Design a protein with these regions (language model features):
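Conserved phosphate/anionic-ligand binding catalytic regions in large, soluble enzymes, centered on
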Residues: 6-18, 168-187
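Divalent metal-coordination and catalytic microenvironments
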Residues: 11, 60, 175, 248, ...
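Single conserved hydrophobic/aromatic residue that forms the stacking wall/gate
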Residues: 319-331
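Short glycine-/aliphatic-rich beta-strand segments at the starts of folded cytosolic domains
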Residues: 292-304
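Mobile "lid/hinge" segments at catalytic clefts and subdomain interfaces of large enzymes
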Residues: 192-294
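Glycine-rich nucleotide/cofactor/substrate-binding loop typically near the N-terminus or early
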Residues: 23-24, 28-158, 218, 227-230, ...
Length: 331
């Protein structure tokens, strides 16, 4: 079975997820034109190679009108790391999460006064209109919208407002839309049969947002991570952003330790901040010996039926179940 595994020992962010997925391809630069053909208005995907604590990997940058937005947290912790372009892009910087550190809490980390002309916010209906016109298959579009539905629901709970009244800030920007669309496209293109992830390292301390300084995880991120194993640790800062949390929540089927698998490719997505440990998101693509099996459990209350009639009903049920998943239990 083809397995995709996310190692979230340094959290997860939208651009890091995209970069790590691109790293799984033998020639990531050849995939870049496909991302730029998605058709997000005024958006250009660019790719940089670099190192973090000696680990080589990729960094995804999204340019809006030829410019890249940076958030307050990134600006505060930024450090040059000798990146070299893999396409028509300038050399850049590395350090930690997300060029835009796209924190869902619709305030996300933008520095007051740092809002460029392309720093626009959208509500859910605006985003749906943008996604509708993208050059993606219907199934990929459905996943993009599902990720945003999760973000909207988390924001709604955090701010005690109906989803219809939620106006996204950072995660409503075009660069965040680009991260989500690219991640969904690449996961579909890689076509794993199962997706797993480690427990997510969320960081600790506080994070700068448009609404002020909030504890990690920020409220919306916390809601997105409900039901998912997480841990804090001693690293100060937000390691798991809302966009990263929403993407993983939507796609990951099981959170736990790395299972026995034969790896075919390993990818590293570099973050923007510098920490004492390698700030990377690692993905592993390979094969595991586990068999895919579905179990259909039908429960019914029989008042007056002969054994022959019950057997006939079971036979009819099996006809509509494909051979690889023909495991039926009736109680």
């Amino acid at each position: 079975m083809k397995l995709l595994y996310f190692d979230c020992s340094m959290g997860a962010a939208g651009d890091m997820i995209t970069a790590s997925l691109l790293s799984l391809y033998p020639h990531p630069e050849e995939i870049l034109p496909r991302l730029n053909a998605i058709g997000i208005p005024n958006v250009t995907y660019t790719l940089l190679r670099g190192e973090n604590c000696g680990i080589s990997g990729l960094m995804m940058r999204v340019l809006i009108g030829g410019k890249e937005e940076k958030t307050l947290d990134v600006l505060d912790h930024e450090a040059l790391a000798g990146l070299s372009p893999t396409g028509p892009v300038p050399t850049g910087d590395a350090g930690h999460h997300e060029h835009h550190h796209e924190h869902t809490h619709h305030h996300e980390h933008r520095e007051p006064g740092h809002h460029d002309h392309h720093h626009s916010h959208h509500n859910l209906s605006d985003i749906k209109a943008i996604v509708k016109d993208l050059h993606l298959t219907d199934s990929v579009k459905a996943d993009v919208l599902a990720v945003y539905d999760a973000l909207a629901e988390a924001e709604s709970r955090a701010h005690q407002k109906p989803v219809s009244e939620i106006h996204f800030h950072e995660v409503g920007n075009l660069d965040a839309i680009a991260d989500i669309a690219a991640a969904c496209y690449l996961i579909h293109d890689l076509a794993p049969e199962k997706i797993m992830a480690s427990p997510i390292h969320i960081g600790s301390g506080f994070v700068h947002c448009a609404h002020g300084i909030l504890p990690v995880p920020a409220p919306a991120t916390g809601y997105l991570l409900e039901g998912i194993p997480i841990y804090g640790g001693t690293i100060q800062g937000e390691l798991c952003t809302p966009t990263g949390a929403a993407i993983l929540k939507h796609f990951v089927q099981h959170f736990g330790p790395l299972p026995v698998m034969t790896t075919k490719a390993i990818g590293y997505g570099l973050g923007h901040k510098v920490y004492p440990v390698a700030n990377v998101l690692r993905t592993l693509l390979g094969e595991t010996g586990e068999k895919v099996r579905s179990l259909w459990h039908l429960t019914c209350q029989i008042d007056d039926m002969t054994g022959e009639e019950a057997a006939f009903a079971m036979e009819l049920s099996l006809i509509h179940i494909s051979e690889p998943t023909r495991h039926l239990r009736i109680s």
